């Protein structure tokens, strides 16, 4: 007889897949935004472009939090998935709101940079909405 430890696997439903893809897109956009910011002279270093004063990307701690939260939100265990989904939904709203408080929306950006910023914030809100749908689905089980 061998004892096996249960493993917690992520769910493979379309909503979970969309959440993982959405956070993957956010990470790619964050890195691209940091490179754009660096090449345009908005930030002196790559770490500054990914720091608290970033205009075209999320700060590194937010990116790490989103990866951890999507890992939790896509788990089958409700005890993990419910709070992770709720927090991931909140991060979408925080990403949007932070631009009003940190001067990100008032920054002097070119039209292309502004379009990228709008696309990034929209993607953050989209992931937040997906996380909200995941939360509702979990709470209805």
State where each predicted segment sits.
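Membrane-interfacial loop-to-transmembrane-helix junctions in polytopic alpha-helical membrane proteins
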Residues: 8-18, 47-50, 54, 73-83, ...
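Loop-to-transmembrane helix junctions at the membrane interface
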Residues: 67-97
């Amino acid at each position: 007889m061998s004892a096996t430890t249960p493993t917690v696997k992520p769910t493979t439903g379309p909503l979970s897949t969309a959440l993982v893809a959405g956070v993957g897109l956010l990470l790619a956009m964050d890195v691209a935004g940091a490179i754009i910011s660096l090449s345009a002279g908005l930030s002196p270093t790559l770490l500054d472009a990914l720091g608290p004063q970033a205009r075209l990307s999320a700060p590194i701690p937010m990116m790490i939090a989103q990866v951890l939260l999507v890992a939790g939100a896509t788990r089958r265990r409700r005890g993990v998935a419910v709070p992770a989904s709720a927090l991931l939904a909140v991060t979408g709203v925080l990403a949007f709101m932070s631009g009003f408080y940190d001067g990100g929306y008032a920054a002097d950006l070119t039209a292309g940079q502004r379009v990228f910023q709008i696309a990034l914030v929209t993607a953050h809100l989209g992931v937040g909405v997906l996380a909200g749908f995941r939360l509702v689905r979990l709470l209805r089980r």
